Amino acid sequence: FTVSTIHESGYEVVELHDQGSGTRVQLYSFGALLNAFTIPTKTGTINGIDGFTSINDAVANATAGFKSSKLSPFVCRMQHGKYRFNQKEYTINGFYLGEHAIHGLLFNAAFDITYTKSTATEASVIFSHQYKGTDPGYPFPFTLHVKWKLTSGNTLQVFTTATNNHSSAIPFSDGWHPYFTVGETIDSATLSFTTNKQLAFSADLLPTGKTIEDNRFVGGQKMDGIFLDNCFLLDNHSETKHSCTLKNDAVTL
């Protein structure tokens, strides 16, 4: 396994490489995002991530879909960008889609490479960003560490650690917004979840706090003709049970 880094347009592009299988992972320090996960198959290589063409493309189009973005310190939509914490009202000054703030404050942040490791069994990198509380609507400093680890069997893992740098507890949530692809139209792919609980959204895609029974994906559902812009409440993850699987005849993610 190897780790290599090049500089591009003021950022770092990191590649994790399994020399045995040929699997490659491309990561940007811009947003600590996963831009490519290239996997050898019987019919050639497939990139399982719908990424950007370059760093410049990512910088220019980060909010046009938030492809592979890290979502911190809040995920999805926040109604009118407002929330209440410890009896005080705050209004986020981040990115708004329509009337509502969306997908946190670090999706376009510059991360530093703080650790790399390459051995016979893994290639890994840690990106870190120190948020200093600069948004008046979120004056709570924290440090976000994002670790990407490639091991044998085309296994890629992401670990996120947040360190509270404030003097007391802070409001915080974290997520990831990947765009997966199986190398062709999604209509030929099958999607399965370990849940039948879909989160209910309002017309503005804000969570209502309710769930809807949706059994379509428990045993696997072909995506032909299906539109999804929803969240599902997954069962507890375990090392031996995949929470979500997307596959076609060529590749399984």
PLM features per residue range, with description:
Residues F1-I92, L246-L253:
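Beta-strand-rich N-terminal accessory domains
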Residues A169-I170, Y179-L253:
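Active-site/ligand-binding surface loops and adjacent short beta/alpha elements
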Residues I46-G65, Y90-A110, S192-T195, A200-E213:
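Glycine-rich, pocket-lining loop/helix-strand segments that form or immediately flank
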Residues T41-I46, I55-A60, V75, L106, ...:
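Hydrophobic small-molecule pocket/channel-lining residues, especially in calycin-type beta-barrels
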Residues T2-E8, N93-S152:
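Extended, loop-rich substrate-binding clefts of extracytoplasmic carbohydrate-active enzymes
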Residues L16-D18, Y28, H129-F172, W176-P178:
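Acidic, contiguous internal or C-terminal segments within carbohydrate-active enzymes
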